[in-house]
């Protein structure tokens, strides 16, 4: 296989000899360098999945920065949900995908979903705990007296976060295995999911945050209670009908309304 230096030298020589234009040379170099230097897939079929992961990563950073900013974390959660809504359709639009590309798409989508809809909601909960007035008197674990029973509250809530992330991971791994087995026996599209899809977190938790802002009530405990319920639904054997186009559009509309209301409320509060 031709090395990276040889590729560059060949392209430069062709340019000096009056070969193709610079844009073609650059594109050719990128395509060849991609297979020479890097692993992975970088075409349009996975762009939205990568964007979802980037959005989730930013959400985690802002949630854990300083005292915590759960409000901004919810914005990134909604954005990740929007990317996830369309990434599958974009990937399937490429008709000549290889088996490796399809398998890669499934795996990378699940990994991104674990970060976006597993870890990020947990970080939002941690940020809510930090800014909650109800828990302002609860000491930090590293500063607490072992005999102080108040420390049990944050420990219990951290356990809920860990179990939630674990449930999301189990759900995604199970889905990948079942989807691979189904692809060998069925050619039709899936009609039902077993267990609640993890992407539902993109609408469930922003709703809790929206209610908190509308009612001006500290709903930190409710948020963690919802995490417990959702964790169970992730790994339950309930059958959830796969949403059709109308339901997908309805969920997009709900997410857009939640996003707009959160922006408006935060703007009225002088946060933007």
Which residues does each PLM region occupy?
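C-terminal membrane-associated helical module and adjoining short loops/tails
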Residues: 3-27, 177-272
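Interhelical loop and helix-boundary elements at the membrane-water interface
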Residues: 11, 28-53, 92-115, 156, ...
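Multi-pass membrane catalytic core of lipid/isoprenoid biosynthesis enzymes
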Residues: 47-50, 93-172, 209
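Core segments of transmembrane alpha-helices
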Residues: 51-56, 113-122, 196-209, 227
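Membrane-embedded alpha-helical segments that form the functional core of polytopic membrane enzymes
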Residues: 51-107, 157-165, 226
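Membrane-embedded alpha-helical transmembrane segments of multi-pass integral membrane proteins
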Residues: 55-58, 87, 119, 167-170, ...
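Structural signal for membrane-spanning alpha-helices in multi-pass inner-membrane proteins
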Residues: 56-63, 124-127, 171-174, 205-209, ...
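Juxtamembrane transmembrane-helix termini
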Residues: 62-65, 126-136, 174-181, 215, ...
């Amino acid at each position: 296989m031709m090395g990276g230096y040889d590729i560059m030298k060949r392209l430069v020589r062709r340019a000096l000899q009056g070969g193709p234009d610079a844009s073609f040379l650059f594109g050719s170099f990128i395509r060849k360098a991609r297979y020479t230097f890097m692993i992975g897939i970088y075409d349009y079929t996975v762009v939205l999945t990568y964007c979802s992961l980037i959005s989730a990563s930013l959400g985690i950073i802002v949630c854990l920065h300083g005292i915590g900013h759960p409000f901004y974390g919810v914005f990134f959660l909604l954005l990740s949900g929007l990317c996830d809504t369309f990434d599958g359709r974009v990937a399937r639009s490429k008709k000549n995908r290889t088996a490796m590309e399809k398998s890669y798409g499934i795996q990378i989508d699940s990994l991104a979903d674990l970060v976006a809809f597993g870890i990020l909601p947990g970080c939002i909960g941690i940020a809510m705990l930090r800014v909650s007035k109800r828990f302002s008197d609860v000491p930090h674990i590293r500063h607490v007296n072992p005999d102080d029973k108040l420390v049990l509250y944050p420990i219990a809530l951290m356990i809920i976060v860990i179990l939630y992330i674990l449930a999301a991971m189990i759900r995604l791994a199970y889905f990948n295995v079942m989807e691979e087995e189904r692809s060998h026996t069925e050619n039709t599209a899936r009609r039902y999911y077993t267990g609640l899809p993890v992407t539902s977190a993109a609408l469930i938790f922003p709703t809790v945050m929206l209610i908190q802002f509308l009612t001006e009530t500290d709903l930190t405990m409710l948020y963690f209670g919802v995490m417990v319920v959702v964790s169970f639904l992730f790994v339950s054997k309930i059958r959830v009908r796969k949403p059709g186009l109308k339901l997908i559009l309805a969920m997009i509309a709900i997410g857009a309304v939640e996003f707009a209301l959160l922006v408006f409320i935060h703007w009225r509060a002088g946060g933007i």
